[in-house]
C-alpha cells in the first residue's frame, strides 16, 4: 500500500465471517512484514560486518527471501576470505600472493583486482630493493634502483641509491688513502 503507515491492522471485532476475514488478512500481511523486517535486521548486521547471523528460514515460495540472503552472505564471506588471505600474506611479507578476482563480479571484482595491483607493486618494488641490497652485499657498488616509484617506495629507492653512492665514495677514499701509505 502506498500510505506511510504499514503497521495499521484491520479491526477484527466484526461479527462472523467478516471478523475471520479481517484476522486472516492481518495474519498474512503481518507475517510477510515480520519476515521482511527480520531479513532487513540481518542485512543491517551484514552491512555492519557481522556475518555470523543467518536469515530466518521461510516456508514455501517465501523461501526466496532467505535464499537471497544466504547468497548475499556467501558472497560477503567469499570476498572477506580473499581480503584476509591477501592481508595475512602481506603481513607475513609474501607479496607474491594474489586474490582470485575471476570469482567475483562488479565492485567485488574491482576490489580484488586493486588489492592484487597493490600486492604486485609492493612485490616488484621490494624485489628491486632486495636485488640492490644483494648486489651491495656482493661488493657491486655500481648497482642502482631505477624506475618509476611512488610514496615510500620512491623514498626507499632514493635512500638506497644515496647509500650506494656514499659507500662508493667511502670505498674510493679508503682506496686513495691506502694507496698513499708507504711502507
Regions found by a protein language model. Give the residues of each.
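Polar/charged heptad-repeat coiled-coil helices used as signal-transmission/dimerization stalks
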Residues: 1-183
